[in-house]
From Swiss-Prot:
GO BP terms in the entry: DNA-templated DNA replication
Location in the cell: Cytoplasm
Keyword set, alphabetical order: Cytoplasm, DNA replication, DNA-directed DNA polymerase, Exonuclease, Hydrolase, Nuclease, Nucleotidyltransferase, Transferase
Protein name: DNA polymerase III PolC-type
CDD domains: DEDDh (cd06127), PHP_PolIIIA_POLC (cd07435), polC_OBF (cd04484)
Broad class of enzyme this protein falls into: transferase
Pfam families: DNA_pol3_a_NI, DNA_pol3_a_NII, DNA_pol3_alpha, DNA_pol3_finger, HHH_6, PHP, RNase_T, tRNA_anti-codon
Organism of this sequence: Levilactobacillus brevis (strain ATCC 367 / BCRC 12310 / CIP 105137 / JCM 1170 / LMG 11437 / NCIMB 947 / NCTC 947)
Annotated NCBIfam families: dnaq, polC_Gram_pos, PRK00448.1
């Protein structure tokens, strides 16, 4: 029997491909004792008997082969029983991690707690684990130990129990030991697993697996076309051998430590989504991995399993086939394709999902000749539309869906010169079955006749509509079927009402609604419309009281104390309206002398009447280039002059700028369709005359109107559309079928739904089911309008849309060149300033090197029209310097000698040199002897004996304006944050207010925000999404316009020979009408190459320098750049008089700009810089990407290079290569490629190798992803050394400035208690490690400086009620007094209020402080606890002198 069982085991080994001698030793007498097959769940359970324990590596090898061999037919489980089981520390430890992972523990926390250590045997052979406390012990004992013990027994171990002991120190030691051990074994186990799987796969393939197909990517076997495909939404639990088909929306290939690759795809079939994982089996798989692309469709076969890493179901694939997926096709013949004229992109704020590029690509694929973009109230998609259309070669039509409003809504209708005082009024109200005068009926007509505010007669009649009332009607009006059944007919009641009215003035609230129903009824019965004078109390109230938030009848009644007993019953509404009418007319007479009915509309455009007009959508298309500019003016006016909740376009303003614009009637929110739906053809015809063409939409677009009852049913909807088409024919206006498109494909509907849901009740679209408004093919649109007949359908879908597209010119929303402003004499002034300063510094004639550089730069600057850019920068810097604030340069402007000579930057780009300030003698070092002139040793002038100045940083001009000198200069300037608003406003002085704007930005939905929207939607709709589905939905919602803003520094300058509308519309940032600056409507990146942008940045360094200068009286420009004490900070702490241990830093650069972070301090510790040029190198290295870590750092460590000659800044590459012997043009090209992370082409590498360029230099270049400009680094180091000078020689002034200017977060209690308390606070934050909050990390930086100051012998004092400033730290001898702002939770405004109140008169009590200083009880308590309010009573006390205070 045992022989049979052993034979079974031998057969099993053959199936597992474990038959070599190396695999056999542990299995010589092994048997298969039992095999249990669960057919329904496809699970096989082996019971195996082995003579002895398997070493862990053999166990894992066997387990992996077992899983691979049967993976396509069953899930395999194996239980091992061992004749002589062992229990040793080694076996326990070897198996531990695998056991924990495979014991069914579902909690991440439990797995982490278990895997962080390894159990051990004590002297009594007990298995012990250690816990840090009782809570952890209970947690492990109750939830982890049982499954783990069982898993060990299934692996062949003897039965044992694990005992948890509490020992904090041992627990930590075990964790550390385990981590070290785990790192050592991970790679080995992964390699063994990979080898096992590879071996098994090779065997199966050699036994006749289907060969890989050519063409589309195929990983694994081919999946037969007849194999059933499961919908992802139907997969809710683990399953074997499932086939799914999906769109790849995310792909990642990751290299594992074992050397294999892991392919992870996220795919969707639009019912749900799945993460698919596949491990490579060799180079062939890895090549196929590269062939799977995002945007393709794949068919996948594999097992659905719970992924312990993702904590979600995932599809572990064994076969992935790229497949063709059926997509929508436009089969209309060429020349008969429709043109979409109403389309929203992701620039329609929070309402549409796809970019214009998506639509253009689809339109091109379908062969459509043109496409319109018509976003809601903005044209921010135009730049992308222009570029996409040009690339695709289709015509782009530029439009906008405007919110059209009447300039003012009439108060009176049927104007008549009749006196209002003493007139008879009939105030009436109707109740109806709906909102459409055409399709709904009046069911109650009530009125009161009033004279001198008294009711003199009453009219009240129900009308039988001839059909049962809906539940909605009864709920809204309180009118039931019983009340209207058997009532008089509409015709009879309307006749009676006319007799009742006589010649009285008719009044109603929103009277156009009621009159609309009445006039439609009169028309229906062949009677004349109402001709009496009419007053609308709704528009009258809006005119008289424009600041009210609501004008509903019940709200107004409450506001003016008028009784309204039962709102939405006609007679009660009428009487209340009558009383309001009396009050309003009396007020109108008193304020505006309105005495006659025909005076009511004299002021209807007053008081921002456009705000109260109902916006109607209208499509504006730019027909000509002039029309585009007019459109820009309209969009600007709507955002700047007529913004109220949404940007509005008054009808008169549209008329003013209508030239070159085609106006369409838009969607169901347009006034023509609304009139046709609610008031009929006569009213619609009157509205339609304003438009150039009329629009109708497919049936899905109107479904919300049917759902809400505004349209009775589809039949009525089709009738309205027929009437719209007829109206177009009657008026000789083209009617076009448009999609009102909001997303590309039907499956994209959910993305828009999530966006709308995120806005809550604020968006009315949340109150209805959203329509399916996807981008339709010609076939789809023709099918939808088939009810109109084939000829008419083709006319509105194809013929008319093409005609409108053909009538529109080719329009260009972007310019093709840069338009710079003009400043009279700019060229001459720049040349003169340059030469004057050059001669003052270097003499006349100039040295040849200087003359050549100046000539070359001036030729480039003046020849390309850049003089004005330089002059603007010069004026800004000069004004700031004059006002007492130094300006730091950013970027590459320091590469320009002209910028230096005109005072724009302090950085001198010439080669290192001496120059004499007295006789202008100079000597240059041009062969790389020095990197910076600041490093030159002191030397007297050989001509006159004066101490010479060292200058020059060897920066090529090419890095600023390009090799040909024609690149638009981008001059970035660092102004003091305090001075930045003044500098911004100074541009208005230079160019005029209408020629300068802030650079606009567009904020879109970010990944994390979209994720939040999806999670909220999931919660509110009570659904559960897989992680991959959440990722898919979030991806669909990202990139959509959410808000607008402004660049913090960018100022756009419009040349005086053009206006802003030649480039872009304008608006306020984030629609904030109170903002100080208007911004460009287009994102400034879109027009960067067309119009000048000046970056006037706000920065702390210039503010810090100004503060230090004010406190010390030292001119920062006189500070030497080679002071030994200052330079010592960068390599030690001696200059501060403290040890590294005292300040917990090996350098003294805490708080020194650019050199105070842990990362840079670490660089300083490794490099020990000794001079300016080495600091410049470190500045460049610290700002680059892949420049220091894994690159320069390694070269310095292994002695290949030094800090002096590694590549620190981008400019080094060009100058180094020229010094190595490479030609200047190739040197420039290499620099440009390397700084952008593009590597170096082989031909250039060969050129480099032919020079003196070392191999390590080329290798270093190839690793770099981004490099910092040398001029920028030079400016930063310059500021840093100035600040550092004060830190060394004026310490208390330095710390006062630092804490006042650069610090925001304080622990004023710890700081005032001394260094022990500060060190404790630092330790508390450091102990949090990565869990420390951003606020705590900022506080740690402040505490490090506070500790340093205390160690240097200075002190902090708690807030002083009498001495403290609002925000600045006050110097009091060797002590800094904390400002009020340092108190936790006390903001700057309250701090200023306290100081202002104190300056007014001293505080006499805590009550007084709270009242006059606006200080909260929490802050009063804080001040009391910390002695700030010592001696101050709680409450005010009566005093004889109170009246004098």
């Amino acid at each position: 029997m045992d022989e049979d069982r052993h034979a079974l085991f031998e057969k099993l080994l053959q199936q597992l491909d474990l038959t070599s001698e190396a695999d056999q030793p542990y299995f010589q007498t092994a048997t298969v004792d039992r095999l249990t097959v669960h057919e329904q769940s496809r699970r096989w359970q082996f019971l195996l008997k082995l003579p002895s324990m398997l070493p862990f590596t053999a166990f894992v090898d066997f387990h992996n082969h077992l899983q691979v061999a049967f993976r396509e037919i069953a899930t395999v489980e194996a239980t091992i029983e061992v004749d002589q089981p062992e229990l040793t520390n080694r076996l326990l430890g070897d198996y531990w991690e695998w056991i924990v992972k495979n014991s069914g523990l579902t909690s991440n926390l439990i797995q982490e707690l278990c895997q962080s250590q390894v159990p051990e045997l004590d002297e009594n052979n007990r298995v012990l684990l250690y816990a840090q406390n009782e809570v952890v012990k209970d947690f492990l004992s109750n939830q982890a130990l049982g499954p783990i013990e069982s898993a060990y027994r299934r692996a062949g171990f003897p039965k044992f129990n694990i005992h948890v002991m509490i020992d904090e120190s041992k627990s930590q030691a075990k964790i550390d030991e385990f981590k070290a051990r785990q790192e050592k074994t991970d790679a080995q186990l992964a390699q063994q697993a990979a080898a096992a799987i590879e071996k098994a796969n090779q065997k199966r393939q050699s036994q006749g697996d289907t060969p890989a197909a050519e063409g589309p990517t195929q990983i694994g076997k081919a999946i037969k076309g007849d194999q059933p495909v499961t919908k992802m939404i139907d997969i809710t639990q683990e399953e074997r051998s499932v086939v799914v088909e999906g769109y790849v929306f995310e792909k990642e290939v990751r290299k594992l430590r074992s050397g294999r690759q892991l392919l992870t795809l996220k795919i969707t079939d639009y019912t749900s989504s799945f993460a698919v994982k596949k491990f490579s089996r060799g180079a062939e798989d890895e090549a196929q991995f590269a062939g799977v692309e995002e945007g393709s469709w794949v068919k996948v076969r594999g097992n659905v399993q719970e992924d312990t890493y993702m904590h979600d179901l995932a599809l572990n694939a064994y076969d992935i086939n790229q497949v063709k997926h059926a997509s929508r096709q436009d089969t209309a013949p060429e020349g008969e394709k429709r043109v979409e004229l109403h389309l929203h992109t992701s620039m329609s704020q929070m309402d549409a999902t796809n970019s214009i590029g998506d639509y253009v690509k689809q339109a091109k694929k379908w062969g459509m000749p043109a496409l319109a973009i018509t976003d809601h109230a903005d044209v921010q998609g135009f730049p992308a539309a222009f570029n996409s259309a040009a690339k695709a070669g289709i015509k782009m039509l530029y439009g906008v869906e405007a919110n059209l409003v009447d300039d003012g809504v009439p108060i009176g209708y049927n104007s008549a010169h009749v006196p209002l005082d003493g007139a008879t009024y009939v105030v009436f109200d109707v109740e109806t079955t709906g909102l459409s005068a055409i399709y709904d009926k009046v069911i109650e007509l009530s009125a009161v006749k009033m004279e001198h505010q008294n009711v003199v007669d009453q009219f009240e009649e129900f009308i039988d509509p001839g059909f049962p009332l809906s539940e909605q009607t009864t709920n809204l009006t309180s009118i039931t079927d019983d009340m209207v059944a058997g009532s008089k007919s509409e015709e009879e009641v309307f006749k009676l009402f006319r007799e009742f009215c006589g010649d009285a003035i008719i009044v109603g609230h929103n009277v156009t609604f009621d009159v609309g129903f009445m006039n439609t009824g009169y028309q229906r019965h062949g009677m004349a419309e109402i001709s009496n004078p009419i007053i609308d109390t709704l528009t009258l109230a809006r005119f008289l009281y424009p600041t009210l938030k609501s004008y509903r009848l019940n709200t107004l009644a409450k506001r003016f104390h008028v009784s309204l007993e039962h709102h939405h019953r006609a007679v009660y509404d009428a009487e209340s309206t009558g009383h309001l009418n009396y009050l309003f007319l009396k007020d109108a007479e008193d304020r505006y002398d309105i005495q006659y009915h025909d005076q009511l509309n004299d002021h209807m455009t007053d008081n921002d009447a456009y705000k109260h007009a109902r916006p109607n959508h209208a499509i504006l298309l730019a027909k000509t280039q002039a029309g585009l500019k007019n459109m820009f003016k309209l969009v600007s006016a709507s955002n700047v002059d007529y913004y109220y909740r949404v940007p509005r376009v008054p009808r008169s303003v549209l008329e003013e700028y209508r030239e070159g614009i085609i106006v369409g009637s838009a969607c169901s929110s347009g006034e023509v369709f609304t009139a046709m739906m609610q008031k009929g053809q006569v009213e619609a015809a009157a509205k339609a005359k304003f438009y150039d063409y009329l629009e109708v939409q497919p049936s899905a677009a109107y479904q919300p109107l049917i759902d809400s009852g505004l349209i009775a049913d589809r039949e009525n909807m089709e009738e309205i559309v027929r009437n719209m088409v007829k109206l177009g024919h009657d008026l000789n206006k083209p009617v076009v079928a448009t999609g009102d498109v909001h997303f590309l494909n039907p499956d994209d509907y959910i993305y828009r739904k999530i966006l709308i849901h995120s806005q809550g009740g604020a968006n009315p679209l949340n109150r209805q089911e959203l329509p399916d408004v996807h981008f339709m093919t010609t076939d789809e649109m023709l099918t939808d309008f088939a009810y109109l007949g084939e000829e008419t359908a083709k006319e509105i879908v194809v013929t008319n849309t093409q005609k409108i597209a053909d009538d529109i010119d080719e329009v260009h929303p972007l310019k093709d060149k840069l338009y710079t402003p003009r400043m009279e004499g700019a060229e001459d002034e720049i040349r003169q300033r340059t030469m004057d300063t050059a001669h003052a510094m270097y003499g006349d004639p100039l040295p040849e090197l200087v003359q050549h550089r100046v000539d070359r730069e001036l030729k480039s600057i003046i020849g390309n029209g850049f003089s004005v850019i330089y002059l603007i920068a010069q004026r800004l810097v000069a004004k700031s310097n004059k006002d007492g604030y130094l300006v730091g340069s950013r970027g590459s402007v320091g590469s320009s000698l002209v910028a230096t000579l005109t005072g724009i930057t302090e950085v001198n780009p010439l080669p290192p040199h001496y120059r004499c300030p007295k006789c202008q003698y100079s000597h240059f070092y041009t062969k790389g002897e020095y990197s910076s002139g600041y490093d030159l040793p002191e030397k007297d002038c050989p001509e006159c004996g004066t101490l010479m100045i060292g200058d020059g940083h060897n920066i090529p001009f090419e890095t600023f304006l390009g090799f040909k000198g024609n690149k638009v200069p981008d001059i970035d300037l660092n102004f003091s944050g305090d001075y930045q608003p003044i500098a911004h406003n100074y541009t208005k002085v230079l160019f005029g207010e209408k020629n300068v704007y802030r650079a606009g930005t567009i904020g879109t939905v970010a990944d994390k925000t979209a994720y939040g929207y999806v999670k909220a939607y999931e919660r509110d709709t009570e659904q559960t999404f897989r992680g991959a589905e959440i990722d898919r939905l979030a991806k669909g919602a990202t990139g959509v316009k959410r808000t607008t803003g402004q660049h913090p520094a960018g100022i756009i300058v419009v040349p005086d020979y053009m206006d802003i509308f030649d480039f872009t519309p304008i608006q306020y940032p984030a629609d904030d009408q109170s903002a100080a600056w208007q911004t460009t409507h287009f994102d400034f990146h879109s027009i960067h190459d067309n119009i000048l942008k000046i970056d006037i940045l706000g920065h702390d360094d210039p503010t810090m320098i100004r503060t230090l200068q004010d406190l010390s009286g030292v001119d920062p420009t006189t500070i030497p750049m080679d002071d030994p004490g200052v330079m010592g900070l960068f390599s030690g702490t001696d200059s501060l008089g403290v040890t590294p241990e005292q300040i917990q830093s090996k350098t003294g650069t805490l708080g020194v700009p650019e050199f105070g972070t842990r990362f840079v301090r670490g660089m300083l510790e490794e490099t020990h810089p000794q001079n300016y040029s080495q600091l410049l190198q470190i500045s460049g290295l610290s700002h680059g990407t892949d420049v220091w870590l894994g690159n320069a750092e390694e070269l310095i460590k292994n002695g290949t290079a030094t800090i002096a000659n590694v590549i620190g800044c981008r400019d080094n590459i060009m100058t180094d290569l020229i010094n190595f012997g490479l030609d200047s043009e190739t040197s420039f090209q290499v620099m440009e490629h390397v700084r952008k992370g593009r590597g170096i082409p082989d031909e250039w590498q060969e050129k480099m190798k032919a020079t003196d360029c070392p191999d390590w230099y080329i290798d270093s270049c190839l690793k770099i992803k981004y490099m910092f400009p040398r001029a920028h680094a030079a400016a930063y180091v310059l500021m840093a050394l100035r600040v550092a000078y004060f830190k060394v020689y004026f310490p208390i002034i330095y710390y006062a400035a630092y804490f006042s200017v650069r610090a925001d977060d304080f622990d004023v209690v710890a700081m005032s208690q001394g260094k022990t308390a500060v060190k404790a606070a630092m330790k508390a934050i450091n102990d949090q490690g990565m869990d420390a909050s951003a606020k705590d990390k900022n506080l740690l930086t402040v505490l490090e400086l506070a500790n340093e100051m205390l160690e240097r012998g200075f002190k902090f004092k708690m807030i002083d009620l009498e001495k403290s400033d609002a925000a600045d730290w006050i110097i009091d001898g060797d002590t800094l007094i904390a400002p009020f702002k340092a108190a936790p939770g006390l903001g700057l405004n309250v701090a200023k209020q306290i100081v202002a109140a104190r300056n007014d008169r001293p505080f006499i009590s805590k009550e007084d402080l709270a009242k006059r200083g606006k200080v909260s009880k929490t802050l009063i308590d804080f001040m009391t606890e910390n002695g700030v309010l010592a001696g101050l009573p709680d409450e005010n006390q009566l005093s004889l002198f109170d009246d004098l205070m």
